[in-house]
Amino acid sequence: MGQKVHPNGIRLGIVKPWNSTWYANTKEFADNLDSDFKVRKYLTKELEKASVSRIVIERPAKSIRVTIHTARPGIVIGKKGEDVEKLRKVVADIAGVPAQINIAEVRKPELDAKLVADSITSQLERRVMFRRAMKRAVQNAMRLGAKGIKVEVSGRLGGAEIARTEWYREGRVPLHTLRADIDYNTSEAHTTYGVIGVKVWIFKGEILGGMAAVEQPEKPSAQPKKQQRKGRK
């Protein structure tokens, strides 16, 4: 039986950046890794309803910088920035160094695999039919410009006695093409019948130029030159 390699793991350093970007010596490495895990666990639990896509952690010069990618930045920031300040203090206590928290807005949540998987999960927990939830996610992604999407759910679908797996796919999802920008993520729906697993693959196009093209900051659009007005004769 054929097995699939993790689509994100195989593309790290080719077209996918790491979620933790820091260097440490042998003594500090384990402590940093442990605090990264605890910070992510705390933020994921605290921001459960804030549609968090991913959490990126950097460690510049004895401090920690956390970037939260979310589709609902208002919930993370809170009234007058109170909530984000509370998060900053807790993260600083966990990491043991000064903390800085940045918020990055996810403009198109329909094209983010984690947010799509969480959306399907919440619908399944509200007893929406799994086929309807899957088809809606596929249609929304294709409408907003995805080159391809595959959605898979597995478990006691519809309360069936025997667990099974069902999936929908539209467009192309080339898992073997390393330069393909494929966003993959999973989620779990805890229903009265048991746990239903959700997997989402979204193909957004091919990245030519490798990591240099991914990390290159967007250049500001050149302003059109003002046309000189001709003098009247």
UniProtKB/Swiss-Prot annotation:
It holds the Pfam family KH_2. Residues 39-107 form the KH type-2 domain. InterPro entries: KH_dom, KH_dom-like_a/b, KH_dom_type_2, KH_sf_prok-type, Ribosomal_S3_C_sf, Ribosomal_uS3_bac-typ, Ribosomal_uS3_C, Ribosomal_uS3_CS. Disulfide bonds: none annotated. It comes from the Bacteria. Gene3D superfamilies: 3.30.300.20, Ribosomal protein S3, C-terminal domain. One of its GO terms (molecular function) is mRNA binding. Keywords: Ribonucleoprotein, Ribosomal protein, RNA-binding, rRNA-binding. GO terms for cellular component: cytosolic small ribosomal subunit. One of its GO terms (biological process) is translation. Residues 214-233 are annotated as: Disordered. Belongs to the universal ribosomal protein uS3 family. NCBIfam families: rpsC_bact. Part of the 30S ribosomal subunit. Forms a tight complex with proteins S10 and S14. Binds the lower part of the 30S subunit head. Binds mRNA in the 70S ribosome, positioning it for translation. This is Small ribosomal subunit protein uS3. It comes from Pectobacterium atrosepticum (strain SCRI 1043 / ATCC BAA-672) (Erwinia carotovora subsp. atroseptica).
